[in-house]
Swiss-Prot record:
The gene is panC. It catalyses: (R)-pantoate + beta-alanine + ATP = (R)-pantothenate + AMP + diphosphate + H(+). The active site is at H38. NCBIfam families: panC. This is Pantothenate synthetase. (R)-pantoate binds at Q62, Q154. GO terms for cellular component: cytosol. GO terms for biological process: pantothenate biosynthetic process. Beta-alanine binds at Q62. The reaction proceeds by a bi uni uni bi ping pong mechanism. It comes from Oceanobacillus iheyensis (strain DSM 14371 / CIP 107618 / JCM 11309 / KCTC 3954 / HTE831). GO terms for molecular function: ATP binding; pantoate-beta-alanine ligase activity. It is an enzyme of class 6 (ligase). The keyword NAD does not apply.
Length: 283
């Protein structure tokens, strides 16, 4: 039975107790509304560790002024039932008041890595992400933490935080979980209309076309980006907000590709903004 924990004090006590008995803790941070991508990470954590903790916390610090924090789906009962079925040990479900009893005097600022891609459109977003993840790491003290490669920029920033702040934690990036037709699983997919849902598969198809170009020897970012743009404008009604190619995990924009990259895109449909990416190894 998955145990719900709502206070920092109890979570810290449990973590200390498990550590004192040389038990390994796996941690999957989420904002809830769990889908198969989250559950795959939970399954991996259960396989890898003695205990698995899943946090469900909608973090206000990572929402901008034009982003509706109150509208984010909150489905703790359904989430808890899914975690219980898998055999997760604990769900850490603190309130905002528990995590932030007073306005923070200190926070973590992400510099260059947050000034591109999603970070450029959402100022302060990654500061909020890194601040809460840092707090969660200190509360739960995991040995391994699991993050999805679907949010590749976030993964790269978390890896950098662990490196620079000397957290004794292994970060495990998990492959993007997709629907049978290739659409990346996301809590936002429920906001797509039927027609948009059919079109949304073209995001991944455009990335696969880009990879084919790369594998065939193309190294010009402009050529690859043009191919993605043409495919998306032809096959979807969404607004293309970004197509970019960056080195990974350094997050340096590429004009002439020389090494490991990730190709990222963002498309806005009527009620949902979808992102997707693929990481391409140097051939």
């Amino acid at each position: 039975m998955t145990k719900r924990i709502t206070t920092i004090k109890e979570m810290q006590h449990l973590s200390r107790t498990r550590k004192a008995h040389n038990k390994q803790i796996g941690f999957v941070p989420t904002m809830g509304a769990l889908h198969d991508g989250h559950l795959q990470m939970v399954k991996q954590s259960i396989a890898d560790n003695d205990y698995t903790v899943v946090s469900v916390f909608v973090n206000p610090l990572q929402f901008g002024p034009n982003e509706d924090f109150d509208a984010y789906p909150r489905t703790i009962e359904e989430d808890e039932a899914q975690l219980d079925a898998l055999g997760a040990d604990y769900v850490f479900y603190p309130s905002v008041e528990e995590m932030y009893p007073k306005p923070l005097e200190l926070s973590i600022n992400v510099h260059r890595m947050a000034e591109v891609l999603e970070g450029a459109k959402r100022p302060g977003h990654f500061d909020g992400v890194v601040t809460v993840v840092n707090k969660l790491f200190n509360i739960i003290r995991p040995d391994i933490a699991y993050f999805g490669k679907k949010d590749a920029q976030q993964l790269a920033i978390i890896e950098k935080m662990v490196e620079e702040f000397n957290h004794p934690i292994t970060i495990r990036g998990m492959d993007t979980i997709r629907e049978l037709d290739g659409l990346a699983k996301s809590s936002r997919n429920i906001y797509l209309t039927d027609n948009e849902r059919q079109e949304a598969v073209q995001l991944y198809q455009s990335l696969l076309k880009a990879k084919q170009l790369y594998d065939a020897g193309e190294r010009s970012s402009d050529v690859i980006i043009d191919e993605i743009h043409t495919h998306l404008t032809t096959h979807t009604s969404g607004t293309i907000e970004e197509i970019a190619i960056y080195s990974y995990p350094e997050l340096i924009e590429q004009t002439q590709i020389t090494g490991r990259i990730f190709i990222s895109l963002a498309v806005k449909f009527s009620q949902a903004r979808l992102i997707d990416n693929i990481i391409v190894e140097k051939s």
